């Protein structure tokens, strides 16, 4: 059953990302979530307003504005990110990670500040997010089933960009190294990240320390950065869970344990 709910949450979040889909709140055990807004006052996420705030993003560009053809022989740029570092001081200096682990973080990850600057930079350079299914199509003909590049219709002066998030699993080892711990669908229908401050052990929900809700907010504030509501793609391996939810069974956990017995196989042949 836990596999089903995690996969359902994954599907909802991927759909939200592909179709357009901070603040800080203390998680509640009840049905309500109280969010602290930018003025410091508490607001109830529960609302009867059924208007999707990202409708404006999806409908920002009208068809008559898409006058630039981007053909199959032209490059569609791709940026991919591993989980971003929420607490760089902790990750690079104060946690118990080895020096090699810190080098790995520096090689493969970016901090929240770096990520925000990258988004602003590609936006300023005229890139626009496009959905992968608009870039490629699966076709079946007499030669079989294969993928073909499509011609994109873009606003004049824009360049297509695909963003993907790799390893959106929130591995257990990362929880001690200054990262957020899972993605949560809030009562407002939007994606939040759960985070524990490594210095205070306070656990809270945030939209400011994780790549997914940061991109959500950036697109919401810059609707011209997205074509038809496109945002990012999740790359899920399923290893050690999905989106911060542990879906592996006891056999998987035992196989990952450094204390697992080592079996030696010998040949019975003379």
What are these regions (language model features)?
Residues 5-10, 14-263:
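Terminal accessory/targeting
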Residues 265-269:
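Conserved small/polar residues in nucleotide/adenosyl-binding loops
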């Amino acid at each position: 059953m836990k596999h089903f709910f995690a996969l359902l949450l994954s599907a909802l979040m991927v759909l939200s990302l592909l179709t357009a889909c901070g603040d800080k709140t203390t998680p509640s055990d009840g049905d309500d979530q109280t969010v602290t807004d930018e003025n410091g006052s508490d607001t109830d996420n529960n609302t009867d307003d059924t208007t999707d705030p990202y409708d404006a993003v999806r409908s920002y560009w009208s068809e008559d504005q898409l006058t630039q053809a981007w053909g199959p022989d032209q490059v569609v740029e791709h940026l991919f990110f591993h989980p971003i570092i929420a607490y760089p001081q902790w990750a690079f200096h104060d946690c118990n990670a080895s020096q090699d682990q810190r080098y790995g973080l520096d090689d493969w990850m970016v901090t929240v500040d770096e990520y925000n600057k990258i988004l602003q930079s590609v936006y300023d350079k005229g890139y626009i997010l496009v959905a992968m299914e608009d870039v490629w199509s699966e076709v079946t003909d007499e030669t079989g089933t294969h993928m073909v590049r499509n011609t994109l219709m873009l606003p004049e002066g824009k360049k297509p960009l695909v963003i993907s998030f790799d390893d959106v699993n929130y591995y257990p080892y990362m929880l001690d190294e200054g990262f957020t711990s899972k993605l949560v669908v809030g009562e407002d229908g939007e994606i939040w990240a759960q985070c524990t401050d490594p210095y205070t052990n306070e656990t809270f929900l945030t939209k400011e320390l994780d790549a997914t809700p940061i991109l959500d907010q950036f697109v919401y504030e810059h609707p011209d950065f997205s074509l038809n509501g496109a945002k990012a793609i999740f790359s899920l391996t399923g290893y050690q869970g999905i989106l911060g939810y542990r879906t592996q069974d006891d056999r998987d956990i035992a196989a990952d344990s450094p204390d697992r017995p080592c079996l030696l196989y010998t040949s019975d042949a003379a």
